[in-house]
Amino acid sequence: MSSTNEQDIPQAEVAAPDGTETDNLAIIARQAIVDANRAVYGYELFDRSTASDSHTAASDAALLFNALSYAGTEALVGKKTVFINCTHESLAGGHLELIHPDKVVLEVPPLADSATAEEIEARVATLDALRTRGFRLAFDQHVLKRSYVSWLPLAGFIKLDMQAFKPELAGPLVKFAGMHSQATLIAEKVETPEQYQLMADLGVKLFQGYWFAKPSLVKATT
């Protein structure tokens, strides 16, 4: 299996209506999430606009939500599932009201390392409400820590960052996730064939990283 070049991923462009200011044109990158046959399951979106003086996680999340509400998921990713990096502030805000949840996965970050058990538990109500509305939630490997046990049943996806742990820990992480959740596992930041083979042999079905596809650009009006 060989990696997929950026040019191999079809680019999409959502044309701005006549009279639309270029300041409202968002440059969004999408990176494919694929199965073992390199069939695209979905795309993770990233803000790549340069108009703003600075980017923060919150501003990037707001821009992506606005682009989705304006253009719709199909214009940005076709009929595939879209994965969006969120902040906890954006999850509690009104950005999600105009987005149809069926094809949207919200990537929820862990709290700061200093977060208490009570602070982690306090997020459950918001996360559960999003699931009730039809959104699926994705967490990274932090959700497998004991302190996040209350989040684990809410996971639709767990993303295992191949750059964040040693190869010998892959097996225990995959086994623990399979025993304690119903989540679909995604190996992300897969950059070598060895990393892919390691996770595929452990039963992981979805993959993301430069070994498969680099991000490609999508233009959308916000």
At which residue positions do the language-model features occur?
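Catalytic core of bacterial c-di-GMP phosphodiesterases, primarily the EAL and HD-GYP domains
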Residues: 61-129, 135-140, 144-147
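A short, charged/proline- and glycine-enriched loop
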Residues: 40-41, 102
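Short, surface-exposed loop/strand segments
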Residues: 21-26, 43-46, 63-65, 69-71
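Surface-exposed amphipathic alpha-helices with a cationic face
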Residues: 123-134, 171-181
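EAL-family c-di-GMP phosphodiesterase catalytic domain
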Residues: 1-40, 48-52, 107-116, 140-144, ...
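Short, well-ordered coil/turn elements that cap or connect secondary structure elements
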Residues: 100-101, 132, 152, 180
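A short, polar/charged loop-to-alpha-helix boundary motif
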Residues: 49-66
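N-terminal start-of-chain detector that recognizes signal peptides
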Residues: 13-20, 53-58, 76-80, 129-133
